[in-house]
Amino acid sequence: MKILVWIIGAILGALTVAMMLTAGWEVPPIDSDQTGFRGTGMVEVNNPRMAEARLQEQLAVVPQSSPPPTGPGPTAGEIYQNVQLLGDLTVAEFNHLKQAWTDWIAPQEGCAYCHQLDNMASDELYTKVVSRRMLEMNWTINEDWDEHVGETAVTCYTCHRGENVPQYGFYNSDAEAHGGSGMLGWTAGQNRPAEEVGLTSLPWDPFSDLIEGDDSIRVVGRTVLPEGAPIGSMQETERTYALMIHMSEALNVNCTYCHNSRNFSTWESSTPQRVSSWFGLEMVRQVNAEYVAPLGSILPPERHGPTGEGRKVNCTTCHQGLPQPIGGMSTIVNYPALQGRGKTAMSSDLHEEDFAAFASAELHQQQQSGDDD
């Protein structure tokens, strides 16, 4: 009997040690910032060391960029063949942007990731067709979704971070593959903890219906007593909560970053960030529906998920654990061609003015050097 007690005690002790070592404990002190009336739970809780480490880790790998070239010159459309979208850039501007794309998306493969090196004009590689469509998506985001991206804007690097395919996103789930049969019952697409929804038992794929599709996210009524048609079933409510958990994890924030703890559903007392997040959700819906999902038909099998479709975009694709992607750092400063369709090239007057200023500065520097000698 004593041996059995010792064995049970040893097992419990080992489990306790394992829990203490693997439960993700954080060392105090923890910062808490009050964001609303005191005593209402309106507070943001963060581990300042982990938050700073996460930010510095992302900043450390941002590729260096050089100022855009200035001065007049022939356009890319005049010199190169099959330049469908950036033909009004000068050759220097065009190549400057192309080098950035290489650094952002294919630093190992180089130009060969999208181009046939013996015929750069060819559209034979699917990656070139995809990249052209992604440029149009980049323009749409920066032109039409200022309420979400602001002046920081986005570039290819915002999502790709040096990878051919962005590290984060989602595939449409195959519910049948995880569904029970017979006495095992039906899983209803949940109760299988997934990192995308914070390892909860909530539905692991709230994305297909809510940010690829256009199902209503709201499941809370606007009146005290229910009126009219039901707003959301229990399953739809769990799906919405799964999406909210995903947003919290993607930005590394609490619920009160957007919502007022007194009444989560009311807009009047919500924080300004809730407005930005609403535009962000609508933006992601458009990006998935109009740009990302349609490209699935030209992707090779190795790029497909369990349902035969390509990977889609969610909040983590850009944010990666920060309230603002890359801590709010803008990577578009030296690449005005990515700001929108109407900004693909600076005016010729500006080219000449900048070139003249540059030449004058160079001449002045040479004269100074001559005087010093």
Regions found by a protein language model. Give the residues of each.
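N-terminal export/targeting leaders of redox proteins
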Residues: M1-Y113, D118-D373
